[in-house]
Amino acid sequence: MKITSASLFALSATALSLWAPSGYARQNDNTQLVTANRFQQPVSSVLAPGEVITREDIDRWQAKSLTDVMRRLPGVDIAQNGGPGQTSYIYIRGAEARHTLVLIDGIPLAKSGITGIADFSQIPLALIQRIELIRGPRSAVYGADAIGGVINIITENSEPGGQITAGLGSNRYQQYDAALRQKVGEDTLVTAAGAFQSTRGYNIQPQSAYAVDGDRDGFRSKTFWAGVNHRFSDSLSAFFRGYGYGNNSAYDAGYQDGSDKRQVYNHTYEGGMKFSEERYSSELTYSYQRYKDYNYASTLGLYGPGTSLDDMSQRNLQWGNSVAMANGTLSAGIDWQQQKLVSRDRFNADSYRRNNTGYYLTTQQQFDTITLEGALRGDDNNQFGWNGTWQAAAGWAFMPDYRLIVSYGTAFQAPTLGQMYGQSRLFVASNPALRAEKSHQIETGIEGLSGPVEWHLYVYQNKINNLIDYRADENFVGTYYNVQSATIKGVEWSGSADTGIFTHRITLQYIDPRRDQDNEVLAHRSRQQYKYQLDWTALDVDFDFAWQYFGKSYNNNTNQYAATQRRMPGYTLVDFAAAYPVTSHLTVRGKIANLLDKDYETVYGYRTPGREYYLSASYSF
């Protein structure tokens, strides 16, 4: 029997038709979220669109990378230069990839390189215990970068126990990880974890005219995590954690002795104190990150003449406070950040430093059926001065189980150090006059519980001014500059329901992202997205089925070197996974990714994986 997308979706639709009124548990879910306003609150109370992904979700989906996880979420589009370990870009609600603020345990992720884009392909999935996603502007809460949204990756698990996992898959995929969380006495929890992941990969550019590009492009990652939490009293505790990873990936150079290997090294150390008593809580955290990114030619070696290095060190100090009030919560704090970037090759080196101090105030208040939310923030940056942002939202529960939401928010994106001061090794000239990108978004939404279906509908418009773009002269010396603006309009609907043994999740999205100067659609954005996920348990086996459709997009925007846009066709992906608990401690899992073996590209000329098979086993104790 031939398996088709239509037949699989028909099976899902049949299951969906079996709805029974059991969806209220999801509406009354007490899942807590911190990222929206920097204080803990139930997901159902947040006025911004948000998602919480747990480690249990990641294991059920049997995701192999962070991009696998993010692709399932509402409002998220992904472009990647091939398979595992290859450069990836995540677009939230049509905003640029650099317009997403990425936090690790609430601390901004250090990003090397000139673009200011977080490369999700380099963040090991084994580190992640939980992900919180907020869609829409959040600069009034966190400062720069949060134009399209915020992704907070949480690495800590406070539950004692341990787990060992081993897995194999297509293209000689291997996965091994172990974690142990042990209580020492009544007040101390010690955690240690490590992971290894590798794949032989495949040739990501089979159409390349260069013989050196005919090899496989593999990936290897090693990860560690260690931490200790100690409680001095019921109100005072302290923590320290350190983690890091080393990644090796291969890619295609395009010419003899060109860079075709990448090595990334990251290590992070964090420590802090937490105080909580009655209505008041406070947390003080210090973090140090070091991120080194090498690119080199395999024919010349890591220390050969063609090697380049981006070496970023980042220090963060955060002091946050929250007070529970009669009708809600008030939060205020200070963020300090120092970045130092050294970018070099054999002949040239560029060094930059930046300091930023931010002051924020956020609140949410409840008055009968009205919920009000607001935030103010000011950032003092030694390179581009003072920048203020604000946002406000109101929710009205106009009838039981239904709420109307209106929000407005401003945001900004600071130029990177490399964009402002150039990188001579990359023939990028300086432009210290670059202005910060600024945006303002207005959004309306309605959400409700209709029978078994919990649903959310949002309509939004995001206007981004001073967009930063790149151009080069006739000698190929380039510079970054501010262009006019872009406007992104969108509508998204998401819903979920429990029907007997089945749990359904559906996302429908349409966006219209355009440059204002010529009405051209922005590159790498699928204007239509349809996503369906079905989870169920039968005969003690947990099943997961995911169907995703991404509409057509464009690979580029026009410039002096590209007179037209290259159209990228839409594509459909289907994944299927199953897990069986052999004992109360041992679970075996299997997955077929890209079940229909679709041949598609998200970046022109870069092949994506075909059908792949995975098998793993986990032992918990």
Ranges and model annotations:
Residues 28-61, 89, 97:
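N-terminal periplasmic "start-of-domain" segments of outer-membrane beta-barrel proteins
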Residues 67, 71-107, 129:
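Extracytoplasmic beta-strand/coil segments of soluble accessory domains associated
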Residues 70, 131-133, 151-153, 406, ...:
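Non-catalytic regulatory/gating segments with a bias toward low-complexity or hydrophobic composition
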Residues 108-135:
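Short acidic/polar hinge/loop motifs at secondary-structure boundaries
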Residues 139-140, 152, 159-163, 167, ...:
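Periplasmic-side early beta-strands and strand-to-turn transitions of outer-membrane beta-barrels
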Residues 233, 326-331, 335-465, 505, ...:
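Structural signature of Gram-negative outer-membrane beta-barrels, strongest in the C-terminal barrel
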Residues 256-272, 276, 310-315, 383, ...:
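Outer-membrane beta-barrel signature, preferentially recognizing the C-terminal barrel domain
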Residues 326-327, 365-372, 459-463, 481-558, ...:
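Gram-negative outer-membrane beta-barrel transporters
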